[in-house]
Amino acid sequence: MAANEIVAQVTNLPVIPAATLKLLQLLENPTENTQAALDVIQTNAVLSAKLLRLCNSAAIGLRKPVASVEQAVFFLGFSEVQRLALALGIGGSLKRKPKGDETHGRELWHHSVVTAYAVSLIASEIPEVDVEPSVAFTAALMHDIGKLVLSEALTADMLAAVRGKMQSGQSQSDAERAVIGADHAEVGACLLASWRMPAALIEPVANHHAPIFQPAPGLSVLVHLANCVAHQIGVKPGWDVFSTVVNQEAAASVGFGAKQLALILETLGGQMDKVDQFALAA
C-alpha cells in the first residue's frame, strides 16, 4: 500500500491546532513572515497563555517572569519564541499514542525533543548546510510523526510481523515497508503534504533515514544525524555504535565524524535536564 493511501484510510490522524498549522506554513519564508507569525501567536489566547507558562517554567530558566508575548520576544528572541510556540502545538499530537498506549506516546515525544535539541547543536557545528534554525528544530520535532499514523493503520497481526522482522535484524523502516508497503518516514511526509506544509519540512521528514547529500547535503542529513545521536542517549555512546546506524556517506558529506559526535554528545548530555523539563512542560 502506498503512503498516501495509508494516510487517506486512517480516520484517527494526529491533529495539529489551526494556529500551529499556520505557523508551520509560515516557515516557507521564515524571515519574511516574522510579523505574520508573531500575529498568529498574539491573537490566539490559548497559545499565548501556554507560551507564557512555558517561558516562565524551569525548562526555560528566565531570571524573571514575562507577562506578555512581547516580553518573551525581548528576552528570548523571536526565533526561540517561535520554536517554543511550535513545540507546544506539535507536542499535543506526538504525546498522544493511539490505542491507549500513553507511555509510548511520551517516549516518542521525548525522543523528538532530544532530536530537535541535537539538530540545533549539529547545525551550529556545520555552517556549510544553510538552514533556518526554526525549520531545523521543527523538522526534527516532527520527523517520526508517521509512526502515529502507522500505529492506527497496522492491525495487531501487522504490528507483530513488523516486530518479528525487526527482531530478525531488519531496520524498522525495512520491516514497515515489507509488511505494509511504506515506512513511517514516507507516511509522515505524506501527512505533512496533506496539511500543505512547506517542502523545507516535508523533505527532511521523508528522508531522515535515507538522507539526501547529492549534489549537496541538505536538512535531511542534519535530521538523520540528530536522530542517530538521540538514539545514543541512554546507551553506551561512541563512534563504534554510532557508525553502525548512521549513513556514513551522509555523515562524511558534512564532515561529521568521531570528534564531532563526541562534542555533540557531551554538549547534549549537559543539557539533558533542560531537555527533560522541556519535554514535560511543552
Where would I find each of the regions flagged by the language model?
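Terminal helices and disordered tails flanking the catalytic cores of nucleotide-processing hydrolases
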Residues: 1-5, 248-282
